[in-house]
Structure formats: structure tokens, C-alpha cells
């Protein structure tokens, strides 16, 4: 080893460092020069093999070279980092004189809008909004509502059961059972929320929203029921149309009825549309919640919120409400 070799190595190392174009290349040079097996490090390891009289001078020379190269590496790294930052600032610069971008405005889902509209109308009629659990037991969902264990009417409801016998409620009527058990007549209430049935097509969903109403008082009659629902339908659709009540069967009411409206279609023709079910509360239901059916009578009704949303907004396929397509939902914002 001679000093000229060290000087030549130093000159080449400094030239390579100055020519480095990126941080990765610079790190490669640092390892090649000053790393564990770098050329400068290997020179320092060879000092022990030199004659004693040469070690001090060459050792001092190598240490100065190492410090010089280290300083050059640090300076070049700072220069490359500064250049990279400047480029990034240019690439990501924002012209503050340009007009700003408006934030996306959200809006209520059409089902939520419909649900709120219905509950608001019934609130004006004096009905209290009540909520209840979506996971029910057989008593509140079926038996208390005059669905005995082997009653054929249970086949009307395609039910999701849990292993312990509980179930996802098939209607919000269970909320009425709980409310009647805790309150004494007279009372007016509506129960709103999600219900679940194993059914899915253009007009049915495994999960949908339902509102059921209940009125109990002395001398409540079917005429009161007809007047209440006729007033609600006219308030919701904001139009007058013919309403008819057809006899129908529901285990928890007697007599029961389906409610149809004379709906004017886009071609100006009129057809009857079924919109909800109703009836006078069955005496067995009152008995199951400890209310004297000889003293009190009442009526109940139920409707699908999505059905009303489809009619109000002209939607043909119920499934569109649950697909979360922003293009569809933006129409109602």
C-alpha cells in the first residue's frame, strides 16, 4: 500500500459521490467505500501489516480520507433530498387562485325519507313512535298474536331462526305486544323498523322496513279505522283518490281487511293497488296481554315502507333501494 494509491482512491471516490443522481446510488457508494467490507475500511484493516514507522502517517491519512468521504456523502445526500423535495413541491403545488371544488352533499335515503314522512303524519294524529328488538322470541312474534305453535298461518311468514329458538322478527307486531303489556288503554302507538323474511325478488327483500299502528280505547270501531287510514293515505300521497277495504285474513285481527287505492298510472289509466293490511284487534291478543276485551276494542294496521317509497318516487324494483348505487340515490338528495 502506498500513499499514491490512497490519493487515487480518494479522488475516484469523491468523483463518484459527486456524480450520484439519486439516494439509492448514494447509499450503494457509502457501503462500497465505508461499509464493513468497503474499500476504505479494508485499507484501515491492513494497517497492522505495515512497518511500525509507516503506520502512524498512513493511518492519519486514511482517517482524513474517511472523514472527507463521509462529509462528501452527507453533503450529496442533503443536496439530493433538497432536490427531491423541490420537485415534489412543484409536482404537488396547488394554484390557490383556481376555484375550489365543492364537497359532495349527502342526502337522506328515499326509504328514510318515506319512513320519516309516515311517522310524522301519524304523530299529527296523536300516535306515539315506539321501537323494539329485532331479535324476538316466539311468544312476542307469534303466539301472543294468536299464532299457536302449529297454526297454519305461520306458513305465511318465511322466518329466519337462530339455533336457540329465537328469530329475526317477521313483523313489528311484537313491539305492540310489549307496549300493550306495559301500558293500559287508551293508547295510540306505531312501531317502525326493520323486519326479516326469507323472500327476495323484484317486489320483496329479505330485509325491509315496516310500520304497524295500534289504537285501543272504549268503543273504537271499524269506521274509526277506515277514517284514520283514509286520512293517512290522502296526507301521504297529497291527493284524493278512492280507497276500498277488502275482507282478508290476519290471525291477530278480526275482521281483517286489505286496503287498496285507485292509482292513476303514467298512461292515465287507473288500477287498484294494495297498499296495507288492517283490522280490529282480535280478543285473544288482548287477553294475552291482560286487557279486558269486553271493555276495550281497538284496531291495528301495517304497511311496508319500501312499498310506499316505490309508489311515491316511481321506482319499479324494490332491490334498487339496497344496492347503494350513488347514481340512483343522488336523484333523491
UniProtKB/Swiss-Prot annotation:
Subunit structure, as described in the record: Tetramer of two alpha and two beta subunits.
Gene3D superfamilies the UniProt entry points to: Bira Bifunctional Protein, Domain 2
Main location: cytoplasm
Organism field: Xylella fastidiosa (strain M12)
Name of protein: Phenylalanine--tRNA ligase alpha subunit
InterPro entries per the UniProt record, alphabetical: aa-tRNA-synth_II, aa-tRNA-synth_II/BPL/LPL, Phe-tRNA-synth_IIc_asu, Phe-tRNA_ligase_II_N, Phe_tRNA_ligase_alpha1_bac, Phenylalanyl-tRNA_Synthase, tRNA-bd_arm
Family statement: Belongs to the class-II aminoacyl-tRNA synthetase family. Phe-tRNA synthetase alpha subunit type 1 subfamily.
Gene: pheS
Pfam families on file: Phe_tRNA-synt_N (PF02912), tRNA-synt_2d (PF01409)
Amino acid at each position: 500500500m502506498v500513499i499514491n494509491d490512497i490519493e487515487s482512491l480518494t479522488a475516484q471516490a469523491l468523483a463518484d459521490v459527486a456524480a450520484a443522481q439519486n439516494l439509492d446510488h448514494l447509499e450503494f457508494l457509502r457501503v462500497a467505500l465505508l461499509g464493513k467490507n468497503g474499500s476504505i475500511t479494508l485499507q484501515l484493516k491492513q494497517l497492522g501489516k505495515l512497518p511500525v514507522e509507516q503506520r502512524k502517517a498512513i493511518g492519519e491519512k486514511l482517517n482524513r480520507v474517511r472523514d472527507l468521504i463521509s462529509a462528501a456523502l452527507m453533503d450529496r445526500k442533503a443536496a439530493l433530498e433538497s432536490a427531491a423535495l423541490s420537485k415534489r413541491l412543484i409536482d404537488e403545488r396547488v394554484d390557490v387562485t383556481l376555484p375550489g371544488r365543492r364537497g359532495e352533499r349527502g342526502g337522506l335515503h328515499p326509504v328514510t325519507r318515506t319512513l320519516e314522512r309516515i311517522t310524522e303524519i301519524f304523530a299529527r294524529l296523536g300516535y306515539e313512535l315506539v321501537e323494539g328488538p329485532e331479535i324476538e322470541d316466539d311468544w312476542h312474534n307469534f303466539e301472543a298474536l294468536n299464532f299457536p305453535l302449529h297454526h297454519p298461518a305461520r306458513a305465511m311468514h318465511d322466518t329466519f331462526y337462530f339455533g336457540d329458538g329465537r328469530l329475526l322478527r317477521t313483523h313489528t307486531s311484537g313491539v305492540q305486544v310489549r307496549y300493550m303489556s306495559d301500558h293500559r288503554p287508551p293508547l295510540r302507538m306505531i312501531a317502525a323498523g326493520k323486519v326479516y323474511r326469507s323472500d327476495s325478488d323484484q317486489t320483496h327483500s329479505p330485509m325491509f322496513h315496516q310500520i304497524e299502528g295500534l289504537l285501543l280505547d272504549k268503543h273504537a270501531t271499524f269506521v274509526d279505522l277506515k277514517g284514520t287510514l283514509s286520512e293517512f293515505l290522502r296526507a301521504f300521497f297529497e291527493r284524493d283518490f278512492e280507497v276500498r277495504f277488502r275482507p282478508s285474513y290476519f290471525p291477530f285481527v278480526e275482521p281483517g281487511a286489505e286496503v287498496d287505492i285507485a292509482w292513476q298510472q303514467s298512461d292515465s289509466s287507473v288500477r287498484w293497488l294494495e297498499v296495507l293490511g288492517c283490522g280490529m284487534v282480535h280478543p285473544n291478543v288482548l287477553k294475552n296481554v291482560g286487557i279486558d276485551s269486553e271493555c276495550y276494542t281497538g284496531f291495528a294496521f301495517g304497511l311496508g315502507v319500501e312499498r310506499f317509497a316505490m309508489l311515491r318516487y316511481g321506482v319499479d324494483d324494490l332491490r334498487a333501494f339496497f344496492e347503494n348505487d350513488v347514481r340512483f340515490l343522488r336523484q333523491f338528495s
